[in-house]
From Swiss-Prot:
It comes from Aspergillus oryzae (strain ATCC 42149 / RIB 40). S-adenosyl-L-methionine binds at residue 251. The active site is at residue 299. Belongs to the class I-like SAM-binding methyltransferase superfamily. Cation-independent O-methyltransferase family. It comes from the Eukaryota. Its EC number is 2.1.1.-. This is O-methyltransferase aoiO. InterPro entries: COMT-like, O_MeTrfase_dom, SAM-dependent_MTases_sf, WH-like_DNA-bd_sf, WH_DNA-bd_sf.
Amino acid sequence: MVCVPSSSSVMELANLISQSIPKLQDESPQRANDARGNVIEACSKMLALVTSPAEMLKEMVLINLASLQVINHYQIASVVPLNGHIPISELANKCGLPVDILRRILRQAMTYGAFSEPEPDCIAQTDVSREIPRLSPLLTYQLDVCLPSMVRLLDWLKDVDGEHACAYQIAHDTKDTWWSYASKRPELIENYGKYMALITSGGAHDVSYVLKGFAWEKLGNAVVVDVGGADGFVGISLAKEYPNLAVIVEDNLGLKDSADDNIPQHLKSRVVFLPHSFFKPQSALSRDADVFLLRHILHDWNDNDCRAILQALAASMKPGASILVAEQILQRPGAASWQRERVMRALDMQMMIQFGSKERAYEDWDALFKSVDPPLEIVDCVQPVGSADSFMELKRRA
């Protein structure tokens, strides 16, 4: 049965789009970004209104992901010239794929805008396909690591109290957490670091919001520990912006070479990488820190593991020191924009599937912090305009 949308609802959305489009060129980046968000949300809602429920469900299949996974794995977008075109037989030979198989995969990908066929059996780039090499770390993580986990969610739910902590462990036939599993596979850790740097460059998770979410300038000469800081991209940004800060980046030993390469020569006196597990007490070097930054760390862990991480920090903090937790705060259904809620709920599902963890509401965060021994309390919470993350400053309760 086809659902007929209300013409007034469709017109309201069309009017919103018409009103927002001129603002896309606004001199204010924030106003332009808000207008862009309005257009995306209105278009998404309009599509949902005019698409029948059956059509909507059919669109949610994994076929698009299958072709995209092949394109990313074989680096096809890096072989197709940026301008002009390439015969599909030559492309297939360079990628090591049968011509007929490649033709079918690419023609399916063309239905969602990736590549074009300007002449029979000749492949050319589109704006979409040109982005694939840049986004490869994200695609590799989502399609090669997360996708197999997603399709095992049902198996995990059938034995949710069993030996596996999440669907990821079933998919990859391991009892290890993702982090333990990846630590034995340097290519996974390296790609994950690139993935994190990619998703925090632009958009609602941009690293610039770290600079706005806390009064760093008021610290004066201070030491900041970027706990679980990957290859140092956040710590480097802090040190560049605030010359009085010294930054210690802590993470897996496998990231040390990448971090050392990333740190500019002129910052090496103020930014250092220190191999460290955040489940263990801080080293003598880090115990003198004024701020311990936990950015996108705790949502990867269940409550018990979060308590262990926070407890190790709380026990190491000098008097007056702070923990700064940068995380998404889940809002009640309908409180955020439609598009923002989609992203929040998708991330929450990913945490469940990949880590056996979750995104948390403010009340969840508050209860978690208070359950640490010694208890931690939120003394400030800032969400910069445009940021998906809130910055919660914690102190040991007096």
